[in-house]
Amino acid sequence: MALLLSVLRVLLGGFFALVGLAKLSEEISAPVSERMNALFVQFAEVFPLKVFGYQPDPLNYQIAVGFLELLAGLLLVMGPPMLQEISNLFLILLMMGAIFTLAALKESLSTCIPAIVCLGFLLLLNVGQLLAQTKKVVRPTRKKTLSTFKESWK
């Protein structure tokens, strides 16, 4: 199970690092960069904190999301265990925000599926790591043998 969690962690971390890098760099692909800029204009219009009067600049919003994805992805792959857990939490929150944004824009389910799948894998990783830590803390019970009973009566 530990190997499976490590593989999932590395794949998710690499994926988010690449996606974050794509949001930060225009040199990766010009058409993709232009499309992403147009999408973040729409995303900024339905930003969750807009109800409190804050609406981010689309370019700054894209840079912030890209930086968070890049940093959290790299920490998920190469960071110490505590930072891996924190970066996993940040990515879970980021994916929840992405799903909220897509739902607010009334996008089709097929558009939401990548964010939902990523959220599912991040939650799976989180639960798997939690179970692995719990397994380390809980000691297995010793089997009672005849010698154990004799020692307990003395």
Curated annotation (Swiss-Prot):
GO terms for cellular component: membrane. The chain crosses the membrane at residues 63-83, 85-105, 112-132. It holds the Pfam family DoxX_2. Belongs to the DoxX family. The keyword ATP-binding does not apply. InterPro entries: DoxX, TMEM35A/B. It is found in: Membrane. It comes from Homo sapiens. Keywords: Membrane, Signal, Transmembrane, Transmembrane helix. This is Transmembrane protein 35B. Its main location: membrane. It is a multi-pass membrane protein. Residues 1-22 form the signal peptide.
